[in-house]
A protein has these predicted regions:
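Acidic/polar, glycine-enriched structural segments that form the non-catalytic walls/loops
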Residues: 1-62, 96, 103-106, 135-136, ...
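A conserved hydrophobic secondary-structure block that centers on an alpha-helix together
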Residues: 4-10, 61-65, 71-77, 81-104, ...
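Short helix-capping and inter-helix turn/linker motifs at the boundaries of alpha-helical repeat units
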Residues: 11-12, 52-53, 65-68, 116-117, ...
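Extracytoplasmic/secreted proteins, especially bacterial periplasmic and envelope-associated proteins
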Residues: 12-19, 73, 86-89, 93, ...
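Alpha-helical support elements that line or immediately flank enzyme active sites
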Residues: 19-33, 70-87, 127-132, 205-216
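Short, mixed-charge, low-aromatic patches
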Residues: 45-49, 80-84, 182-185
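A generic structural signal for ordered alpha-helices
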Residues: 52-56, 65-68, 72, 104, ...
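Active-site cavity-forming subdomains of large catalytic enzyme subunits
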Residues: 98-221
Length: 221
């Protein structure tokens, strides 16, 4: 909270600002214990990291409960500016989720994939972090995950139902939008096609920018 010093005559406004900063630190939260144990993403199986490595390489710490649809616009970009090292640890946790579960999550909460909300905003978070100079995460593996979400769908309905991959991606790739006639199976709301299209368009912009920054010119073009 002391990363930003505010000097202003209205103490109520200053208190309001720091109160907001404090609340912005609640989530995402650290999932790894001090002894090195952490629950593997999507399975909950206990994994272990040598505590001595945790003290030497804090990037190994695991973070979870990314209410992504709510935080990708403001909170995470703020982290990139004021606590970039912490942001990198969180971005690496997203990459780890992809490696452990096979897909970059849409809305990772309760240490699991969920089908909550629309969009694919982990891609935006990762691209924004890299664009702002955050480097303590595996950007190449992050891009691999982002690209997979943008072009592939789960092979089984069980995976799709569990929240893996983008919903209605087939229609989106075919038409460049999601028509109202696509009922979007397992969606919380059945009339969100326009909103989903807009969110995916922004997500794809982020994927394209990541491709450009990493030198994947064919993908970018």
């Amino acid at each position: 909270m002391h990363t930003i010093d505010v000097v202003y005559s209205d103490t109520a406004k200053v208190n309001q600002f720091y109160g907001a900063m404090y609340r912005a630190s609640f989530l995402p939260r650290e999932m790894s214990d001090c002894n090195g144990d952490y629950p593997e993403f999507s399975t909950g199986i206990t994994k272990h990291i040598d505590p001595s490595l945790l003290s030497l390489h804090s990037s190994l710490k695991k973070y979870g409960d990314f209410s992504m649809w709510d935080i990708y616009r403001a909170q995470l970009p703020l982290y990139n500016i004021v606590v970039p090292t912490l942001s990198g640890r969180m971005m690496q946790s997203l990459v780890d989720m992809y490696q452990e579960g096979g897909w970059l999550p849409i809305f990772p909460c309760w240490n699991s994939y969920t089908a909550a909300m629309i969009g694919d905003h982990c891609s935006v978070a990762l691209a924004d972090a890299y664009a702002k100079g955050v480097r303590n995460f595996d950007a190449d593996k992050a891009y691999e995950a982002m690209r997979k979400n943008a072009f592939e769908t789960p092979k089984s309905f069980a995976e799709y139902k569990n929240g893996m991959g983008r919903r209605a991606l087939e229609s989106y790739l075919r038409y460049a939008y999601i028509p109202l006639e696509d009922s979007v199976k397992e969606a919380f709301h059945t009339c969100e096609q326009t909103s989903r299209t807009l969110e995916y368009a922004f997500d794809d912009f982020a994927v394209a920018q990541m491709a450009k920054m990493l030198g994947h010119d064919d993908d970018y073009n």
